[in-house]
């Protein structure tokens, strides 16, 4: 029984995976930064998508512990960047609203990290652990893709509803204009055929 408890503890430690889902609102020209303490061979992935606001273009930058830019994303409505840590320390990732349109933007982002534990810490002869780790990684990737598609679906649904509203109001306006023109033509033609008598 003690073997199973130790096995569970080792398995949990081996597959520590951290996932965060966040949403922030960036005002024009605002920069919002977040920090992660990472060790050698840890893996980190940042995915973001703008949901609401103007042209929906946001920049993302990732800085290493020395404060140097590792990656800079051009203004985009959605992007993803993954990397494996070579230098341990505090990594910073920032989102910036360039505000080319002067509007606030809502940014949804996920941070996914896999904490690396070396094979020396585990029983390297156990093939089951390798398969479980593979399965865990695959399930995590599927989960993140699903979160990404949910966010995209929300944006597309909002766009479709907005388009439907515009089409509805345009149709109502066309109907009002058509009825007005018909009424005008009826009265105009009626006046044209009236007999004018001289008394």
From Swiss-Prot:
Name this polypeptide is given: Endosomal protein P24B
Keyword Phosphoprotein among UniProt keywords: no
Stretches of the chain found on the membrane's Lumenal side: 22-168
Source taxonomy: Eukaryota, Fungi, Dikarya, Ascomycota, Taphrinomycotina
Domain of life: Eukaryota
S-adenosyl-L-methionine recorded as keyword: no
Transmembrane spans: 169-189
Family: Belongs to the EMP24/GP25L family.
GO cellular component, one term: Golgi apparatus
Protein task: Constituent of COPII-coated endoplasmic reticulum-derived transport vesicles. Required for efficient transport of a subset of secretory proteins to the Golgi.
Ranges for domain GOLD: 31-113
Topology feature Cytoplasmic, residues: 190-199
Intracellular or extracellular location(s): Endoplasmic reticulum membrane; Golgi apparatus membrane
This protein's UniProt keywords: Endoplasmic reticulum, ER-Golgi transport, Golgi apparatus, Membrane, Protein transport, Signal, Transmembrane, Transmembrane helix, Transport
Membrane topology (UniProt): Single-pass type I membrane protein
Leader sequence residues: 1-21
One GO term of the biological process aspect: protein retention in ER lumen
Gene giving rise to this polypeptide: emp24
